[in-house]
Amino acid sequence: RFDPQDRDTQKKFYFFFKHRGIDLYTQYAFHRDFCLATRHRPDGQSYTNLAFPLRLPRDTDKIVGFEERGRARMDGSGSYKGKAEGSNSSAGLWIGSPAGTALRDATHVFWFESGYDAMSYYQLHQKDNRDLWKAVFVSTGGTPTVEQMRGVIACSRSARQHICFDTDTAGREFTDNLKKKIHRT
């Protein structure tokens, strides 16, 4: 785990955040909401990924999987992104808040396709919007499911929902689906 008081733990995360430009202060803000996960294969190989714990909106104490991101490749090309084996990605989402705000207590919920995107947004906008500290950030880890949408909306009915998906075709489709779900509720 990332410990804001322990430089040695922070160094282990450096290569996962460097290529995204996510600074140490943003890592401090979300330090409770990410970790490293290592998979050991039978052939002796092991792979460590940055992991964003997936939780059920109604039971955030229980981790039901991980959204995983690998280190950037040496040539600067992409890196591994996916979900840990056995993850409940149909209902589970990454849920983070710099202030530790519970989803049921949120006044603002920000929706993203990845934990990286959420942290980047926070870093870019927190100086101009001090309320972001108390906001709740959720990541669907890719394509949002009906179960994810229903779960978050049911737990945060009075919160203002901010849709921050990518602006590509898929992101616009996700936005339309989420808007419909919000209006039905």
Q: What does each model-identified segment do?
A:
Residues 88-104, 146-162, 180-184:
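Short, basic/hydrophobic alpha-helical segments
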Residues 163-183:
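Mg2+-dependent endonuclease catalytic cores in nucleic-acid-processing enzymes, primarily RNase H-like
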Residues 18-19, 123, 184:
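Residues at alpha-helix termini
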Residues 46-48, 60, 103-106, 115:
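Short, well-ordered loop/turn elements at secondary-structure boundaries
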Residues 1-92:
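Basic, glycine-enriched DNA-binding surface that flanks or lies within the catalytic cores of DNA
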Residues 108-170:
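Acidic, glycine-rich catalytic loops of TOPRIM or P-loop NTPase phosphate-binding modules used
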Residues 57-62, 102-104, 128-132:
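Short, solvent-exposed loop/turn segments that connect beta-strands within catalytic domains
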